[in-house]
Amino acid sequence: MLSPLSPRIIAAFTTAVGAAAIGLAVATAGTAGANTKDEAFIAQMESIGVTFSSPQVATQQAQLVCKKLASGETGTEIAEEVLSQTNLTTKQAAYFVVDATKAYCPQYASQLT
C-alpha cells in the first residue's frame, strides 16, 4: 500500500498528469507509423526519451492502467504507483499513464484531467 503523500507532491502529480493529458491531443506524430497499440505506446514513450529493457512487460503494465482507471483510480493515483515502482521521473510517469490510456483505452481519457 502506498504511503500518504504530501499535498505538494499530489499537486505536482496532478499538474503533470493534466499537462500530459493536454499534450495527448497534440502528441500524435510519434505514433503515426505504428501498426499496433503496443507499437504506438512504445513509440510514444520513446519520443519522450523513455526506453524499456522489456517492451513486452512495459506494454503489459501499460494495459493495467486501463484496469485501474476502470476500477475508479485516478490518473494521479496511477502515476504515483508508476513513479514508486519504476525509475521514471514524475513527468515520465504521468506520460506513461496518458500514453497507455491513449493506446489501450481512450474511452478513459476524460478521467485524466
From Swiss-Prot:
InterPro entries tied to this protein: DUF732 (IPR007969)
Cleaved signal peptide residues: 1-19
Keywords: Signal
Family per record: To M.tuberculosis Rv1291c.
Protein name: Uncharacterized protein Mb1302c
